[in-house]
Amino acid sequence: MMEKLEVIEILSTTYDGDEFPGYENIRLSFTQLETIIKNKRSGWIDALRNQKAVYLITDISNGKMYVGSATAQFGMLLKRWSNYIADGHGGNVELKKIVSTEGLDYVRKYFQYSVLENYNARMDDNYILKREKWWKDTLCTKKYGYNKN
């Protein structure tokens, strides 16, 4: 079989993920997000650096969700998501428990990151926090998910 394959192109750089698809199409596994951040994918980094957002982390093993927000106070979406890649929990109480009991490999295998709503840097942080609360209430993530507050 191998002798029938033809090499058409050799890439000048190693493949490091897809191009930025637009905020409404972001749905990334932990390893995809990690690759984007560690390789400093310019299209992605530029898009996330100055963006505020309400985002969703989904545990695909059990369907539990965590709703969070990225505001100026916490360094926008790139900084917020970089925190999750660094330790698996980003400082969140319930996510810390998962990393503590199941390990970082669990997060790497089962966590998925997406954007529910995105905003430019000028949007008032208080509005974003209100939208975060609305999503928590709508998705019942305090009762059935990983949100503590």
What name fits each language-model region?
Residues 109, 145-147:
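Long, charge-rich alpha-helical interaction segments
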Residues 122-141:
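Domain-level recognition of nuclease-like catalytic cores that cleave nucleotide substrates
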Residues 64-66, 77, 122-124:
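Intrinsically disordered, low-complexity acidic/polar segments
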Residues 1-67, 71:
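GIY-YIG nuclease catalytic motif and its immediate N-terminal context
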Residues 43, 101-102, 138:
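A generic secondary-structure signal
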Residues 73-121:
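Conserved short loop/helix modules at catalytic or binding sites
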Residues 1, 85-88, 136-144:
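Short solvent-exposed strand/turn elements
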